[in-house]
């Protein structure tokens, strides 16, 4: 019975667009986020006026994850920023089980707490990546 249910997920992923993608076609920085973080990321990019240098891939649901589209997005980016409100970087770990998320070009901005992300937090990380300032990668 479970196998039958999971086969239905594949059909859903093939039939519907399960993600939002916006920004540059060949981005310097690709941002991966989901849920409420997507709106904050969109606000930060608009405020910085870097739509021509940054792109965002935001799955609407994480299961089924649109793995083919996500991998194509990852491959098109020079560097990646994963944004999430989770100290343990659960979204990042989930992505790594589904796609090739190269550690060498991936920066993870994760933190705990009940407070939502701010556009200023995202802007700080994007500025760092766009100016090639190195940062310790924790996840």
Regions found by a protein language model. Give the residues of each.
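A short, charged/proline- and glycine-enriched loop
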Residues: 24-31
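Conformationally flexible catalytic loops at phosphate/diphosphate-handling active centers
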Residues: 1-20
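Peripheral docking tails and interdomain loops at the edges
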Residues: 80, 84-139
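Short, well-ordered alpha-helix to beta-strand connector turns
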Residues: 27, 77-78
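Active-site proximal loops enriched in glycine and acidic residues that flank catalytic Cys/His/Asp
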Residues: 33-36, 58-61, 74, 83-87, ...
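Generic long, charged, amphipathic alpha-helical segments
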Residues: 36-73
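Feature captures the catalytic cores and cofactor-binding loops of soluble hydro-lyases/lyases
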Residues: 50, 66-76, 85, 92, ...
């Amino acid at each position: 019975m479970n196998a039958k249910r999971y086969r239905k997920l594949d059909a859903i992923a093939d039939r519907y667009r399960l993600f939002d993608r916006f920004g540059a076609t060949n981005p310097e920085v690709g941002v991966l986020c989901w849920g409420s973080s997507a709106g904050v990321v969109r606000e930060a990019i608009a405020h910085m006026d870097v739509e021509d240098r940054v792109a965002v891939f935001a799955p609407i649901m994480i299961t089924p994850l649109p793995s083919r589209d996500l991998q194509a997005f990852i491959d098109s980016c020079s560097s990646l920023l994963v944004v999430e409100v989770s100290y343990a970087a659960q979204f990042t770990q989930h992505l790594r089980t589904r796609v090739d998320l190269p550690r060498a070009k991936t920066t993870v901005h994760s933190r705990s707490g009940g407070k939502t992300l701010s556009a200023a937090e995202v802007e700080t990380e994007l500025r760092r990546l766009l100016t090639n300032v190195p940062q310790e990668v924790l996840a």
